[in-house]
Amino acid sequence: MFIPQNKSKRLSLDKIGQLEEDLELNPLDYNKWQKLIDQLIIKDNQEQVRNTFDKYLKIFKFDGASWCKYIKYELNRDEKEKVENLFQQCLGITDNVELCRLYVDYVRGVTDFVTGGEKARGVVVQAFEFAINKVGIDITSESLWQDYIQFLQSWNPNANWEQQQKIDLIRKVYKKFLTIPTENIEVSWSQYTKWENELNPATASKFISEKSGEFMLARSWNTEFNRITDKSLKRNLNPGDHNDEDVVKQLKYWLRWLELEKENKLELKDETVNDKRIQYVYKQATYALPFVPEIWFQYVKYLLVQNEEGNLQESIRLLKEGGLVLNPKSMLLTFQLAELYERDNSFNNAKIVFKNLLDALQKDYNSVANQIAELKERIDPATDKDNIQEDDDDNEEEEEEENDNDNDNDNGGDSKQQPPSKKLKLNPNGGQNGSNSENNGEAVSAPSSSVKLPQVYRISLADSKQLLSFENEQKRLSDAITLTYVKFMIASKRSEGIKEARNVFKQARKFTDIGYQIFIESALLEHYSDKKSTALKIFDLGKKNFATNGKFLLNYLDYLIMINDVDTMRTVIQSSDANFTKEIGNLQEELKLTNLDPITRKKLEKQITNLKKFLKQLYKKYISFAATFLSLDVTHSFAKKCEQLFPKDDPIDLFTDRYKLDNINIIKKDELGRDDILTSFDGIIDEEELQRLKRRKLSNGSGSSSSYSFNEEESKSAIKNIEEQKTRVQQEQDQENQGINKPEESFVGPSIIALMSALPNASYFGLPSESVFNSEKLVTLFANLSNIPSQ
């Protein structure tokens, strides 16, 4: 949902003008281009139609269907010179069966067979051969081949040698045609065999047998193609992107077709012919799915694998004039083209590519920022001063409270600190309790003569969801801009040295929402250019902007550990402690405000959780370093401070964390019977480890006791707990059933029900093939339970 813009709109009757305005804002809107072209053709303003077609085809230059529409428009007005110019433009840049058929039809129409004779026929044959060489391998090219055969069959020779020439030409066309797996190849084969038999039954079997092998391969290929594409592959242009379900489905079909071609199921001996087929399919895929960067990337990658030096310029042209014209905000294609320019020693062109992407992303970022500002302005109306009497002390106290309640972003300290955000205040007439009583201790004190309600947030759930959506999009764009600047800076260092990289870094810092990663990468570039003092200055500069960003500070700490700067490490830990503690306190105060919608509350809680998580991680990293390279006194000092900050945490977790082998806490695993992931002190779960956790095995193992094996004491304890739970279950059943036993309960009994309700479900133990469950101990456990029904 977008906020309406305050701009004048054209009258609804002016459809053409409105479409033109919309296309000025978004020139990649394929559907609106088609609507505009159709409207103009109806209006029949020739110059306007031509201008619109020209503008459209500069962007969608490969759209064969639109070229056909443009040419037919000119043919209807008998503009032959214009038509020929259009054919010259389009036939070199797009491969389209219907466009080639239109070209051949035009050549036949302007050729005088009466006076031209054999020469005129030769011109048409050349046109057919041109079209066949261009699109004859297309699975939909049957109509073009049939046109060619029918044209040759319509020739009425005057001499015997001309008759034989006609037969040879037709047989030659059939020979090429029947090796192509077209849609109705079986019908075409029947047509060919009938022609041979009618021509000369004595020689028919000879010619037919010569082609039957290739025909069988083509027919098998056609069957396989229909199977892998479910007969659902669409060849027309799809204006959707990778988020569109239909596009995802079509992409799957195109990739399957490409794999089929690469497998060479037609058993083509000439590799150049097979390569031509593969490239043709790649082209058709980019025509059908122009807004899917993956297709463009893979096409270029294929060309470079086949012949890197020979296809370098073609790859650059393909991305510059095709992929990035249609996907100007694609990081994938931008970085691919930038690398190609760099390999071609054309870094100035690479700079342009990077800057174009930054401009496009910045434009979108500014648009989202404006939408956020308008939304906040709408949901934060000015306080009615007539109903609230405030003296100077009140104003000062409010300012202090606002400064104490700075609102960070959704990542819990993972982004740059922002100025104190403006509170969304409750209108005096809209308070929850309708009184000026104190609410959760948050009411601002006021003189006894003043009537004042607590200062709280006021935002509807719908507005909160919309704001969250905008903020997520803003974060996505901020990350994309940061990534682009980082890679631009690194590429500049490779090509032009550290000074040019510094210029990019300086430019990146002008973006107010630049990510912390740019500081880390810039510092590392300086470090590996033997500028360690400069690297430290950059890290220090980043620390000022990202004082509560856990990810930045962890990277900073890693760097300080690498260069063994103990004093700065200690300073970073101490300042981070103070900054994080203050920020957590501010957020906790905000949580006390009334009328917080669930989304905002969850957002604040997430920020607090993340801040605590990263503060723990910082302490853990430094304590581990101190225990390894400094002294136990330093280690104990910081460990004590950490335990004071997080008194509810198990001290064993912190202690054993510095006694890991690689990243495995063997002590907890072998001696305490705990999963290292579940009790990890830093609270950060690696995705691979998380999957391992879901599939963990319950086995004794060889030579060691299992963390989850039951000994005799554990069994007794488990039985006792189950007996207690059984009593509760039995009571609930008695109340529910009122003395009437259900069949399933009389079979298993309340003890088993209690046990099963206490155990986790089967998926908790992983796949059946991976789990090891001791059935004997389970039977022993069941046997010791009371209230087991007898058979």
Swiss-Prot record:
Single GO MF descriptor: mRNA binding
UniProt keyword annotation of Cytoplasm present: yes
Segments of this protein annotated with the region Disordered: 379-449, 725-745
Subcellular location: Nucleus; Cytoplasm
Domain of life: Eukaryota
Entry's Gene Ontology cellular component terms: cytoplasm; nucleus
Residue ranges of HAT repeats: 44-76, 78-112, 119-154, 165-198, 231-263, 273-305
Stretches with biased composition (Low complexity): 427-442
Entry-linked PANTHER family: CLEAVAGE STIMULATION FACTOR SUBUNIT 3 (PTHR19980:SF0), RNA CLEAVAGE STIMULATION FACTOR (PTHR19980)
Job of this protein: Component of the cleavage factor IA (CFIA) complex, which is involved in the endonucleolytic cleavage during polyadenylation-dependent pre-mRNA 3'-end formation.
Name this polypeptide is given: mRNA 3'-end-processing protein RNA14
Species annotation: Candida albicans (strain SC5314 / ATCC MYA-2876) (Yeast)
Underlying gene: RNA14
